[in-house]
């Protein structure tokens, strides 16, 4: 099978694509890949580092207000379609999949117009502009949340989940706990604000640290590398309790996620895919700074099923943070109920499900 993949701009579009590619390589070692992204996007460094052939096109996103820049965007889109057709004809893929971000617009559109089987993968509850546009032309739309399905033609929608979920399975949680200094017998909560950290969560944590010192559970706090020194300076003034471990970053996150009992985090699509695949209860603090407030809608999909609590950033304080953690970790029945609810939402074989959809389209 020859697979052309496109997606970029943020890790939320790139990492699911890479997870899918890794799964296909396991199931079909003869498969060949080409990834098309932008020259300046994250994908231009991440994808080649993963050993995947990479080509770039020039494209930009539409501004939401009327702007002369949108005229340039249309011209770039048309040029991107022509460049994509050239790459497609040269690579001759059996199938093309877009995982979001404006770069996959011209790529997937060009493939559809050339009669090649096409799929878009939507990670969030609220679809992006590009995937909504492409849904008119592609063969299938793979979704991760039921709420996303209503935005697409129903005959094309298939629930696959996020391929990243597959990558957190079969991890050694005990090894993960040991690697960060957590003790095995004690309950533990991991708190983090995304790969770069989040200042409002850091501020609430610093305010709460003295009260955390009185708890029977352990706290693993990840500041984000850019915030680490500032957080540690503030912590030194208050004292660092023995049951609180602070790290700038965690490189073996799947192992650590597997080992802890509760997670406090943002509500990005990849994070939720991983948490539900592991059956992990959570307190979700959606980022209010994302397009269409999609993180709050992502969180709502999990909260409504009883798998998480939601704490809006505007309501985030030391007191509300500790309250929500205590209500879950200190109540064995609540913890167990939320574990079961999260597990029922999870799709741990998401990458394989998406590959099955691809196979069916190729064999048509």
From Swiss-Prot:
Its main location: membrane. Pathway: Cell wall biogenesis; peptidoglycan biosynthesis. It is found in: Cell membrane. CDD domains: GT28_MurG. Belongs to the glycosyltransferase 28 family. MurG subfamily. Cell wall formation. Catalyzes the transfer of a GlcNAc subunit on undecaprenyl-pyrophosphoryl-MurNAc-pentapeptide (lipid intermediate I) to form undecaprenyl-pyrophosphoryl-MurNAc-(pentapeptide)GlcNAc (lipid intermediate II). This is UDP-N-acetylglucosamine--N-acetylmuramyl-(pentapeptide) pyrophosphoryl-undecaprenol N-acetylglucosamine transferase 1.
